[in-house]
Amino acid sequence: MKSKRFEVLAARPVNQDGYVQEWPEVGLIAMNSPFDPKPSIKIENGVITEMDGKCRADFDMLDTFIADHAIRLGNAEKAMAMDSLEIARKIVDINVSREEILDITLSLTPAKLTEVVGKLNIVEIMMGMTKMRARMMPANQCHVTNVRDNPVQIAADAAEAGVRGFAEMETTVAVARYAPFNAMALFVGAQVGRPGVMTQCALEEATELQLGMRGFTTYAETISVYGTEPVFMDGDDTPYSKAFLASCYASRGLKMRFTSGTGSEVQMGYAEGKSMLYLEARCLAVTKGAGVQGTQNGSVSCIGVPAGVPGGIRAVAAENLIAML
């Protein structure tokens, strides 16, 4: 028999939540899918001929890009031969330096990285983040938007946000043709509030690049990458086109970061039976291979997908750690 107090608590909406049953065949699984590949690597004449159980002849465009651009070959065979649990313990060990860890992890394949972080519990993942994060001083980003896309209000709000200490500001646009007004209003307002604040206007990628080239924005981060070939193709993209876009931003001196996150592939219906974390490890490998300055990940807009399956939030934390490895 329960008291009325516990009956009332149990009836609250927040306590009606539950988890979706895992469905590995369609990728509705956060970690350790039975269909995830086993880590492996073979190098011949300075070229990766096998990666994660797949021969080069069978590589899709992500595999080819990752093999050619995202893995340090000099130490790869030695690093891949190490026991995953040993690497995981090194990540947590306060006596092992960040540089020593990177010497190993930058030579690992996506499947191996997934296996390594899979050995860690949530507290160990946080300990690893404490050591592995590259940024010495944390900074905050804010969004400055309003229902009517009123540039005067955007400028005023941006100025206040600058005074409050935000390092980056983003605006989004309801009507695409208003984008230049929003971008300029955000830029002017932010600099009035505190000179040096970085601003962006999130749009379709070609338009966003144009705004940057014209000097209306100072960074971009909504350059999405995905973990399977069909999702890339759904957006008329490839890892190579994204890398080219990154070089365009770099040529103008604009800061930019890729965007990815666990759950996007299963949400699009093209997870190929792989776990969300493994697919995100592939995204992060593409990000590193393209040489961009950073990544916006942690599931972001897809958080409801991993959060709805067992171990999902642990997988999101694990992908953040992989981004630092």
Segments the model singles out, each with a brief description of its role:
Residues 1-155, 163, 170-325:
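Anaerobic metallocofactor- and corrinoid-dependent redox/one-carbon enzyme cores
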